[in-house]
């Protein structure tokens, strides 16, 4: 198989890999994260989202929108098309050529899997697109809160 898959556990290496993923996104960037990760997305890695949007990358973001993360989600709407999915678990993102998946402990990512294996990237893109169809627009969910 072409490409490689790496498992990272060092916090600095994880952040570096996320930034590389952000910089490498060319056309699409799809993220599906649990309700606690939007704070991370508008904190340590927000610049990468904003830069990708400026490059014309289509960013789609799925999370469970709650009262606790509502302010973060409103900020995410400035750089991504945001949708809500009840009970979403896990954290992954997929772009044109890469896939990343993180494991959290509290507010920190403690493990990150990063892959450029084309078959895995395509598989994760299809999973995201299936979840996207099942999710509802953020504005609809925010009206319920």
Language model segments and positions:
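PLD/PLD-like phosphodiesterase catalytic module centered on the HKD motif
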Residues: 1-4, 14-15, 37-145
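Interdomain hinge/linker segments and adjacent boundary elements that couple functional modules
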Residues: 1-38
């Amino acid at each position: 198989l072409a490409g490689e898959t790496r498992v990272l556990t060092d916090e600095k290496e994880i952040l570096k890999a996320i930034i590389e993923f952000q910089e490498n996104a060319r056309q699409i960037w799809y993220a599906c994260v649990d309700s606690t990760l939007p704070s991370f997305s508008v904190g340590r890695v927000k610049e990468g989202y904003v830069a990708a949007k400026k490059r014309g990358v289509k960013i789609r973001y799925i999370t469970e929108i709650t009262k606790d993360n509502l302010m973060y989600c409103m900020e995410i709407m400035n750089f991504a098309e945001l949708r809500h999915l009840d009970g979403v678990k896990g954290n992954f993102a997929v772009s044109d050529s890469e896939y990343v998946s993180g494991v959290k402990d509290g507010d920190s990512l403690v493990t990150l899997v990063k892959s450029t294996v084309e078959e895995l990237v395509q598989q994760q893109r299809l999973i995201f697109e299936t979840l996207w169809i099942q999710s509802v627009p953020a504005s609809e969910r925010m009206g319920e809160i």
